[in-house]
Amino acid sequence: MDLLPYDVVEHILERLDVKSLLNCKSVSKQWRSTIRCRAFQERQLMHRRQSCNPDVLLVSVADEFYLLKRVHQVMRTLVLGSSVSVRILTPWEDTLYKVCQSSCDGLICLYNTYASNIVVNPTTRWHREFPLSTFQRLDRYEHQVGSVSWAKLGFGKDKINGTYKPVWLYNSAELGGLNDDDEDYDDEDKNNISMICQGNNNTSTFCEVFDFTTKAWRFVVPASPYRILPYQDPVYVDGSLHWLTEGETTNVLSFDLHAETFQVVSKAPFLHHHDYSSRELIMCNLDDRLCVSEKMWPNQVIWSLDSDHKTWKEIYSIDLNITSSLFGSNGFALRPLGVFDKDKLLFCEPEYGDQLLTHDPKTKSYEFDYRFFSPTTALPLCYFQSLISIL
């Protein structure tokens, strides 16, 4: 290596996996400095993405009331095509979290009503905690009286500034039952409750964004003028987070993480009304494309958005007669996870994620890629291994 120009050495290092690069840091100060450089880390991640094969992470998750106390393995990476998983040790082994379904640059975001939120790189084990939002603090009181919220945290990246942002978007009625006269609230909570109660009269939603620089949450004004569907996971694609809207027709709502503005994406072929839209429509990121999966028996069709021409194209059609014979009958749409080997679709059983299936559109075949042989409360998600952290 000493005989090679250093730019050639960097070119070689960029193509190594993260585990090898972590070992290479001990070779020399120059190598260590290179591997710690953000520009190098971004190039390494780009090469990883070009492999077209993300890794699969299994995260033990909390139920809605955080009742499950026993946790065996908080995080595991899966070996597809087998029943093998590799445990990832974490400092929070005794605490259950919920997880954002969209990873970003190899980072995963975990959140909890009763403990600090966490951004973690499961490959390097780096993690950073950040505080509860206003919504989470107030939602904690809702849990105490038996009410359960359905809003879910989004996580993505401002592509212009390169900053990462956790985002809450929730309908104004979500915390409508709060009373700022309650003695359990502190002054800050009472002020926020008063603001939310006043806002309920003239706004559809509230939006909160966390700034890792100031280490604080702030409200985005104006928030979305459209209410969003319950129980859906925000999806990150290309600098924006996305939700499905509520109403007689279902639209795709986009939040630009740089401009921090909302807009409705072009008209979609699934605009007709769904009686149980949160069950029949699932939004996802497949190969860095915004996709919507629509269940209409006997098929589940997956549409992909062409961001340049603002048009939708059907890219997959899943035969529900076949999958129901494998998974059993279920009222929910199957959950797409990622694309492997350029065009094979990986998806999972919708409620528990305990069985992973691959669909090959060329041969129209289906086969199990991972099966659990005991009950699980963990959810799978796809990510690309990286060296990225949040400074």
Curated annotation (Swiss-Prot):
Transmembrane segments: none annotated. Coiled coil: none annotated. InterPro entries: F-box-assoc_dom_typ1, F-box-assoc_interact_dom, F-box-like_dom_sf, F-box_dom, Gal_Oxase/kelch_b-propeller, SCF_F-box_component. SMART domains: FBOX. SUPFAM superfamilies: F-box domain (SSF81383), Galactose oxidase, central domain (SSF50965). Pfam families: F-box (PF00646), FBA_1 (PF07734). Residues 1-43 form the F-box domain. NCBIfam families: F_box_assoc_1 (TIGR01640). This is F-box protein At2g34280. It comes from Arabidopsis thaliana (Mouse-ear cress). The lineage of its organism: Eukaryota, Viridiplantae, Streptophyta, Embryophyta, Tracheophyta.
